């Protein structure tokens, strides 16, 4: 088996699978970083006998990205049980991983960790590490104050009329000592279950409102307790994976595109488990809307796949009634109507985010394969020469872009492609010193400076451009043409505007639109996107320097505290929106310091 190119593999958590020539899954594994993990299979000479055998008969390796390593564990666990890959080590039983259980069958439910399924309890998991799960239970206990004691201790507390130890220190809501009614306690259990099932936004919103109210009333101790609960909830959420009820059976579909190629990803979920992952690429038609693309993709997907009972989407597809009729006509089971859902609940939305991430990853992988192909790259150059009517092959292409920082600090960027590939050593940044915020004048200045550096360069030199691309429209193109005339050089120049991917040529009133899905258009898009990325990188550096200098204006802030603020808040807008409790929670920041920072941030009117 030929190993995949390292650059094609995402640096994300996920589950990978090796398959034989018949598509049978031989091995399933999980990884915190797919690129590093899969790379180790093909670079490590000291492999075990089992892995060496698996690689010798494998013909294909695939992967599915997920949100975190917990979700990776759950998907791996599900697929090992579903497909029984012959090269995986067999688990003795389901006790290998711990679960979180809520004993809803008891009159006063409790929260506990278990390695085996408990009758009349709702289970969440499995989880990869039991010590992480213990921390999670501790955090959930802090938020909901749910009983965790054993039935024996609970009965003893009821008999004595005194709460258990956790009830005495207010870590438990105290159902054993009748500090709360049965109805109030059941409400807490209901909130806990909703939180664990992914319905977290309402709880966080409620806690934040209470915290702000306490802060406004100067009840800082109560506000601090609520702040700790919010932080605990956010920590639990960061460790949680997508949890689907066993009753959920549906296809989750996401479509992303770059205006020429659409990437479609489908997760087939049966009884709450991801059973299969499918991926395709389609050519996107010209002027096709997102909803039309979604409808077209669904039709093509179910020309290949069997129909599910339910299809879950982010957005409403176009011609929904006609699409539903088409799918139901194809459905063999006439008694069951296919449901298309485009308002997913919070739980389903989280899984759809994972599906969308995989679609984006596959689209990028497709683009990388396409751009790395030598034949395709040279075809794109020949196409450009033909469509732009150039005298020679555009071996060296330079692209120019103008960017700003908060409407000031104008800068220009230049990226260079040679033979259809980026030449990063030739990239350049230019600081533009123009009094007014004028893109046209800035572009004129940028091109003049670049052209003057070429006056001593021979036209047959590899450093001399064969084509200049301006990121913008007619005004920016006019500025570039003016710069060429002023310096006295003749280099083909075109402007590329993003709205319709139009190319503007000097002296021509109408724009040129390259054929969609052509290699030449793909190359120009890649050059333009690289120009944006390079410009954004420089502006990010300048923004950080600007932000730091403005923070030093606040009295009483030294270098260490400024760096702490920058790590916690990315902008002055965030500092102004933050509560005094949020700022004072930073190490070394008291309430007075936090109040001073808030006052100064408002006074400086910083953005």
UniProtKB/Swiss-Prot annotation:
Q: Name one GO molecular function term.
A: DNA binding
Q: Which InterPro entries match?
A: GIY-YIG_endonuc (IPR000305), GIY-YIG_endonuc_sf (IPR035901), GIY-YIG_UvrC_Cho (IPR047296), RuvA_2-like (IPR010994), UVR_dom (IPR001943), UVR_dom_sf (IPR036876), UvrABC_protein_C (IPR050066), UvrC (IPR004791)
Gene Ontology biological process terms in this record? nucleotide-excision repair; SOS response
Q: Which SUPFAM superfamilies match?
A: C-terminal UvrC-binding domain of UvrB, GIY-YIG endonuclease, RuvA domain 2-like
Keywords, in A-Z order: Cytoplasm, DNA damage, DNA excision, DNA repair, Excision nuclease, SOS response
Compartments (UniProt record): Cytoplasm
Give the top-rank taxon of the lineage listed in the UniProt record for this protein: Bacteria
Task: Please list the residue ranges annotated as the GIY-YIG domain.
Answer: 11-89
PROSITE patterns reported in the protein's UniProt record: GIY_YIG (PS50164), UVR (PS50151), UVRC (PS50165)
Q: Which residues form the UVR domain?
A: 201-236
Give start-end of the signal peptide. Answer: none
Task: Name one cellular component (GO) term.
Answer: excinuclease repair complex
One Pfam match, given by its short name, reads: UvrC_RNaseH_dom
Main location group: cytoplasm
Assembly behavior = Interacts with UvrB in an incision complex.
Entries under NCBIfam families matching the protein: PRK00558.1-5, uvrC
Q: Which PANTHER family match?
A: UVRABC SYSTEM PROTEIN C, UVRC/OXIDOREDUCTASE
Provide the function of this protein. The UvrABC repair system catalyzes the recognition and processing of DNA lesions. UvrC both incises the 5' and 3' sides of the lesion. The N-terminal half is responsible for the 3' incision and the C-terminal half is responsible for the 5' incision.
Similarity-based family: Belongs to the UvrC family.
Q: What is this protein called?
A: UvrABC system protein C
